[in-house]
Amino acid sequence: MKLIFTEYSAILIFFAISSLLSSVIFLLSYFLIPQKPDQEKVSAYECGFNPFDDARATFDIRFYLVAILFLIFDLEISFLFPWSLVLGEISIIGFWSMIVFLVILTIGFIYEWYKGALEWE
């Protein structure tokens, strides 16, 4: 148990300091900045123009689909980057497990493309 704590103590200290610092900055900004909401601050901003319509209008479902697809393939990169850093040190099982992961994601991407999820009509 002591060996594990020794190895991860730097990460734990970094996490604690960053959490404390971000909390202090957030609380200071909340208490020190005057809170005076007016009509201009609470209205929707449309690139300098007056809003044409209500800002609470519904979005097209394609925006959500694009956001979900972005998250999926962004997470793929978060798994792929550490794997590429330790590629020379891992065994053949680690290599082929990532290849299987990439093949599954590629098949999913081809399926989405075939079904027209990426088309904007």
Curated annotation (Swiss-Prot):
| UniProt-listed InterPro entries | NAD(P)H_OxRDtase_bac/plastid (IPR023043), NADH_UbQ/plastoQ_OxRdtase_su3 (IPR000440), NDAH_ubi_oxred_su3_sf (IPR038430)
Molecular-function annotations in GO: NADH dehydrogenase (ubiquinone) activity
Q: Tell me its EC number(s), please.
A: 7.1.1.2
GO cellular component terms, alphabetically, are:
mitochondrial membrane; NADH dehydrogenase complex
Name the keywords, alphabetized.
Electron transport, Membrane, Mitochondrion, NAD, Respiratory chain, Translocase, Transmembrane, Transmembrane helix, Transport, Ubiquinone
The reaction(s) catalysed by this protein are: a ubiquinone + NADH + 5 H(+)(in) = a ubiquinol + NAD(+) + 4 H(+)(out)
Q: What is this protein called?
A: NADH-ubiquinone oxidoreductase chain 3
